[in-house]
Amino acid sequence: MRCKAQSAAMPVGIASICNAAARPYRADGADPISVIQRTEACVVAAEPSTVMSIAEVEAFAMRVLRANGLADHQAGPIARAMAASEASACRSHGLYRLIGYVGSIRSGRVSARAQPRLERVAGSFLRVDGQNGFAPAAHAIGVPALIEAAKNNGIAALALTHCYHFSALWHDLDPIVDAGLACWAFTVGQCIVAPHGGNRRLMGTNPIAFGWPRVGACSFVFDFATSAVARGEIELMGRAGKALPPGWGIDAAGQPTLEPAQALAGALLPFGGHKGSALSMMVELIAGPLIGEPTSRAAAALDNGDGGPPLGGELLIAMSPEVFTSGLMHDWHEQAECFFSEARKQDVRLPSDRRHEARQRSEQNGVEVSDALLKEFASLLPG
């Protein structure tokens, strides 16, 4: 069961910044479209922000992507992922990512009208060729087939290839977990991480995600970079003028730094020393060469500097607890829930608790989008 604010397609007439007839609420009473069109109106108070509903966030993302020529079948999955990220207080993968997406569309590096193609390679192994488009569209095509294959065979794998990946992996796993399947996801991120003991970048942030289905409770999903922190978080800290904690990054000379800009010019470090470094190397291999995709370092050589998502595939693996335990005197769900119950007795937070709580708040109160970010979006709207 997924506990999240739904970001369904916006019905006709709903208040939306895509619709000139209605606007989302702002605490200062200003019209956010005017804020975007008249950027001098952005600075109204300390840390000014615009309150938007989840549907309005999705609609705004769609408006910007469409205005830059991205086809709806490409833009829709991206907008939904951004809305889900904003709702979950995952700002590093929310509207902020519009800047990079638009950069790649305008540079021509990504095919704005790419039609992903699903291929059943062998048995329960599936592949979606993204046709040089964005990964969310490839994911939308492939996941229903992955779910069906896993339910029929017990386990199935899906490789997303020839695409550009920017979105959070937990969002990629949500529909699989909702279908009652356990699942993994791996993707190679932008090459910016030095191996443990190294002094220059070699690997991507290389996130790993896992999901476990639950009945009558919020699903168990974790998603974390194998670097000490995601690159997007470093970028946002730099924008906010915040220093990095020790152990997150090194500068171009390989020396420790607390400055976000220096870490972005140098390298991030893996979490957990040699353990995080080894996991990152694993992701490089199974989400790179194993599925016919480049390593992050090889992909970096093809990057044109437009600020958009890196070229890189994704490997998803789905497993059916029903099939795995078929014929056994074993209630997999009861055993798992007993495990979670024991964890709760220690008053611990489970992975994804924070996201679930944020989604509930966002569904009731909307989300706050920085006016400084809205000001930057002015350049993303042609004319």
Which ranges hold each PLM region?
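A generic, well-ordered mixed alpha/beta core segment in the N-terminal half of proteins
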Residues: 125-215
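Small-residue-enriched flexible segments
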Residues: 231-292, 309
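Intrinsically disordered, low-complexity segments enriched in small polar residues
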Residues: 7, 13-16
